[in-house]
Amino acid sequence: PCRNVVTKPVQKPQPPMWMACTNRATIKVAASIGVGALAFSFVDPEEARAWAEIYYDIIKSDACVPIGHAVNANMAMVSNFSVHQDQAEAIRRGQEGFEFFSYAVNALVAHDALPGRSTLFEDFQKSRARSDEEIIAATKAAARNANGIGTPDDIRQHIEGFRDAGVDQVIFLQQAGRNRHEHICASLELFAAEVMGEFKAEVAEREAKKAAELAPWIEAAMARKPWMQPLPDDQIPV
């Protein structure tokens, strides 16, 4: 219905709607109401592929009944992020902060964390399974490190995995724990210089192909949408 929107976005059309998703069940809900799925769980590309298939299978079915005035058919995945030419240094700069973010989110949801009283970071450090140096050693021993924390080549493979799995966008988590501002800026600069360009070059063609493929499904979904009747002036919420 009509309502007073605060703050008032300048963008026209209005910014697309997204829903935070943490598991397959919430992915299904997002697709069924035609909103973007912001996957706030740190999953690997194989699990991401399963989520993308679930999401787009529903978008392309009668089960999609849009809640808004448009369908935002997109899936975004949150990812860890720390880039350095030295893989070990990337881990030292970003791994602990990323792990702490995951720990803190779980603690705030699953436990009664009290501001100014709970000792989340100290508790996290006591419970941490492996040190940075142990993770560095394991990473060096691995045949492949497609990861958001590593060298430009590592993160390139990481993004390629999500792209090939059907993920539309990747959101990099950076400001967490004791991650330093200058390290975050250095990671972003290196990413922009050595990785981002090749993916940006693909965007227009990939988005056009996707839009053409989804157009009949989105048109059918909008035709199923039950539209509300206009409210009398005295019933418009303010």
Where are these regions (language model features)?
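A conserved active-site cap/scaffold subdomain adjacent to cofactor or substrate pockets
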Residues: 22-53
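A local structural motif
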Residues: 9-16, 142
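Glycine-rich, proline-tolerant flexible connector loops at the mouths of alpha/beta enzymes
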Residues: 42-45, 172-188
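Short catalytic/ligand-binding loop motif for oxyanion handling, primarily in non-cytosolic enzymes
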Residues: 26-27, 48, 85-86, 179-181
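An alpha-helical appendage that flanks or caps ligand/catalytic pockets
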Residues: 1-6, 46-167, 196, 200-238
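Hydrophobic faces of well-ordered beta-strands that scaffold small-molecule active sites
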Residues: 17-20, 35-40, 73-80, 170-172
